[in-house]
Amino acid sequence: MGISVHCDIVSAEQEIFSGLVEMVIAAGSEGDLGITPGHTPLLTALNPGPVRIIKQGGEEEVFFVTGGFLEVQPNMVTILSDSAQRAGDMDEAAALEAKKEAEKALANRGGDFEYSRAASQLAEAAARLRTIQQMRNKLKR
């Protein structure tokens, strides 16, 4: 059993994960982060995307967060997100449809067009698809 740190992944609706992990990998606002026990305390914004955790014993689990914050304390990693879900529970068809709708909104700018909202929706849909792809790659191993 390797050295571990406690990790909580919490959405506005519920706690998604709570347990000991050897590593947390997440998409921070300044790039990807790899958090291991003993990491320097940190508070950063998260981009929409996958959060991978390596549990004790090497088992990996993947989650999707729509953004939020990651906080690292000496013995604790906390991820707070508006919305989070296990990657295995994601619907690829819905993610593809959301991506198409966002691309269509960007292409057909109307009078009350909100570019930032459409771009944000496109980024989130693309991140959902990346998370699904990571999950597939994990299952192939």
From Swiss-Prot:
SUPFAM superfamilies documented for this protein: Epsilon subunit of F1F0-ATP synthase C-terminal domain, Epsilon subunit of F1F0-ATP synthase N-terminal domain
TM ranges: none
Cellular location(s): Cell inner membrane
The keyword Ion transport belongs to this UniProt entry's keyword annotation: yes
Keyword Transcription regulation in record: no
Pfam annotation, one family: ATP-synt_DE_N
Keywords: ATP synthesis, Cell inner membrane, Cell membrane, CF(1), Hydrogen ion transport, Ion transport, Membrane, Transport
CDD domains with a match to the protein in the record: F1-ATPase_delta (cd12152)
Record-level Gene Ontology MF annotations: ATP binding; proton-transporting ATP synthase activity, rotational mechanism
Mode of membrane association: Peripheral membrane protein
Stored InterPro entries: ATP_F1_dsu/esu_C_sf, ATP_synth_F1_dsu/esu, ATP_synth_F1_dsu/esu_N, ATP_synth_F1_esu_C, ATPsynth_dsu/esu_N
GO cellular component terms attached to this protein's record: plasma membrane; proton-transporting ATP synthase complex
Family note: Belongs to the ATPase epsilon chain family.
Function: Produces ATP from ADP in the presence of a proton gradient across the membrane.
Quaternary structure, from the entry: F-type ATPases have 2 components, CF(1) - the catalytic core - and CF(0) - the membrane proton channel. CF(1) has five subunits: alpha(3), beta(3), gamma(1), delta(1), epsilon(1). CF(0) has three main subunits: a, b and c.
Protein name per the record: ATP synthase epsilon chain
Native species: Hahella chejuensis (strain KCTC 2396)
Annotated gene: atpC
